[in-house]
Amino acid sequence: MPPTQAESVIRSIIREIGQECAAHGEIVSETLIAFMVKAVVLDPSNGFNMDRTLMKSDVQNLVKLCMTRLLDTKNPSLDTIKMQVYFDMNYTNRVEFLEEHHRVLESRLGSVTREITDNRACAKEELESLYRKIISYVLLRSGLGSPTDIKTVREVTAALQSVFPQAELGTFLTLSKKDKERQLKELTMIVTGIRLFNRDCGKGGEGIDDLPAVLHVAIPATMQHIDYQLETARSQVYRYTAILEKAANDPLMRAELQPYMLKEALYNIRQYEVFLQIILSDIITGAQEVEMMTKQLGAHLEQLKMTIKSKIAVPTSQVFPIFIALSTLWTSLQDETIVVGVLSNLFTHIQPFLGAHELYFPERVMQCHLNGATVKTDVCRMKEHMEDRVNVADFRKLEWLFPETTANFDKLLIQYRGFCAYTFAATDGLLLPGNPAIGILKYKEKYYTFNSKDAAYSFAENPEHYIDIVREKAKKNTELIQLLELHQQFETFIPYSQMRDADKHYIKPITKCESSTQTNTHILPPTIVRSYEWNEWELRRKAIKLANLRQKVTHSVQTDLSHLRRENCSQVYPPKDTSTQSMREDSTGVPRPQIYLAGLRGGKSEITDEVKVNLTRDVDET
């Protein structure tokens, strides 16, 4: 059958089963129906052959079997499957959840962002409208207050005007779209930091909840509630296990317990325990993050107070980074609030799938079968065989791992979620926790633990036999596929959450490693002083910078009255007399010629006797 035709047939089967269930008053999701279809086909007792095309009679039989299972409300196995499907569809690890949450926020702000970045305002009214949109954007992005609250809007407007006055809108409009978006985010963080600081000083903070106080109350309360439910579930597990362990050696008791479906109830509550541990682990991680962020928040607020004090003006280079850091921390606290809420909601919604264990196995019947049985906790079982260890010499062809010889011993992915494979196979499905201290068997790149040394030896003699038994048991009880993490053996049952974390299934032990040593070329540390300055004026500049004279009050002026009290003088270098001359004026004079002529007057008859007298001064006399 072509893939497209097969998918069409499966969809029609799922749709038909959903309609039949609805007719019987049971609303079932398509995901659960699809899981049940796979489970019914996988069960060998139903006789479906995956290698041949399904006939009409096969489809009718498949629908009938699925209907029977889905409408059997007294079956713990169905409750376990419902719990697994719900958890897989609703649980996401912290990192991916926060990434998706931020992506959703960005998509919701997309229309507001485009209205601002695509705006081409020119008139005064248009610029005022744009500024109001920026205020709304800051409020929506920060999540601190409602845009319809007048007091909150006024507070945000005042904070925004202090860092981004309306007069700067012209410069903002000239930026590229990417730069506008970046500046909007920066403005949001700065304004958020200002509001948080004002709230801490008691001068503002309208509409801002005290998130650290809320989380410090909510997280411990949630952890305490989950711890209580976890201990209650474990107590029930230990009682079920004790009865099943007692029945393993008593055929009559096994036959008597058959109608109560005790093993299915054990699988149900074990799966519930696993999910509670996952939720509790995430909440503990969140509590550690909140504690660290609360300390950082207080430190940044104190740093701001020391920087600002009572000053009228402070350089933006000093306070803006702190405001941004405050905003980032507060956003992380908001994320933690959402994570805790989602995990609490998930915890509440999986409780109904725990099943009515009182209905499955009444207390009077349980007390009757507990007579003569020893109820042991998982910790007690591990302590009993803590000293019993596998002798590696007994199995030369198999590899055994121990804590003292394996570097990443605690990080190995143990098969069957750490339960003893031999006990499960030998007792037809009893779940007992394995003890890694006995030794971890490495077989075909997979790791197995056992609850006792004898169980380890029995499994090691024929591993394939017991692995096949576990696989066949999982085909009959499909809830075991997720409970025992058998997804690699049943590819069609890999949940989405497991597919995302597929890489973690291949952690390999580090039992051997290469190491080398080498003497350092330079034993002594270098003596180069990077802060050395040869320039005297550079040293003076640094000294002035360290003194921060801009924030100090200096006195260098005296009045007529104050000069009598003390002398005030400043001097850079010792005084010295010196003079320089760049040009000197000088001149020279040549004697002016003075020559006189006499005897030029005379008659016509007389001869003129001309006398020439030279009165010019000598050059040496000048």
Curated annotation (Swiss-Prot):
Any single GO BP term: regulation of cilium beat frequency
One of the record's GO cellular component terms: radial spoke
Keyword Cytoplasm: yes
Entry's localization field: Cytoplasm, Cytoskeleton, Cilium axoneme; Cytoplasm, Cytoskeleton, Cilium basal body
Pfam name, any one: FAP206
Annotated keywords: Cell projection, Cilium, Cilium biogenesis/degradation, Cytoplasm, Cytoskeleton
Keyword Secreted: no
Main subcellular location: cytoplasm
Chain positions covered by the region annotation Disordered: 570-592
Family listed: Belongs to the CFAP206 family.
Function: Essential for sperm motility and is involved in the regulation of the beating frequency of motile cilia on the epithelial cells of the respiratory tract. Required for the establishment of radial spokes in sperm flagella.
Name of the molecule in the record: Cilia- and flagella-associated protein 206
Organism for this UniProt entry: Homo sapiens
Gene from which this protein is expressed: CFAP206
